[in-house]
Amino acid sequence: YKRQAEINFILMSMLKDAGIPSFPIVMSRRSMGILPYAHPSIQKLNTFIVGIANTDSTLVYLDGSVTHGYLNVLPPVLMVNRARAIIGGRQSRWVDLSQTCKNQLRSMVNAVISPDGKIYGSRNTSYMGQYASTFRKKYQTAKDSTEFVNELASKEDVKISVFNTQGINKFSPQVKETIIFEKQATVNDNFIYLNPLVFLHTEKNPFTQTERKLPVEYPYAEQITLSVNLTIPEGYTVDELPEALQIKTEDGQGMCRYNIAVQGNKLTINYIFNSSKLLYLPAEYPGLHHFWKVIAEKNNETVVLKKL
């Protein structure tokens, strides 16, 4: 962690030269244990980031060693709920870094289904916060844009003919992506079987164990919004449709809503997922397991189109 500290000291010096007040925010990384309230020892501290005075009472946070972040967008290992802001002199206070930014993924798909089961369309996606940071990291560590697009096409099982980004190299909280794609649905006699989400939130339950002895810790809170507009081919009608879903965790801090509707030859899906709780105790695990099980099953449900 020596390099990180050196860079943040340099950053604070540069901010001071520019007349911008800044302070060290000392902490113990999430992987190294929680900093105790009752007896916070210097020996428990192993890194720090920079707090920049935004107003008289608020700070924004920055880690100068991170190349893909932004103001308040920190590496998850530094997003602790208990850090100490050393404001100056003998002044200091506790700060919570666990939810400093909004981590959002918003995607809109507009596509047309052809009688041979091909789905042609566009996807426009906005990545915010941690999603933008992750997208930039993957894009910039790929050998080139072709490799990145090929990996995306393979992961989503689509053919991509156009790929564009906005903000990929900017110091910005947001990255935008646009793709033109083609995807093959399943055709059997007079029926077309397709997943109406086209691009899934999750294919399977990430929690496979029936019991858990240790807590579940999420890296950050998140929000996912998927909107899909599909045009049904002429001469076809909807034969089977998934049911709507709204499910919450027992404490209400996790939620998923899935709505689907047909109007004329238009099929519309609106999907929202929110997760704001970062730590689930072993006693809460069965409810969390069921929550994700239902979400994964809903993500894999299909629409059946029937030829008239």
Indicate residue ranges for each PLM-predicted region:
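A sensor for short, sequence-defined functional sites
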Residues: K2-L308
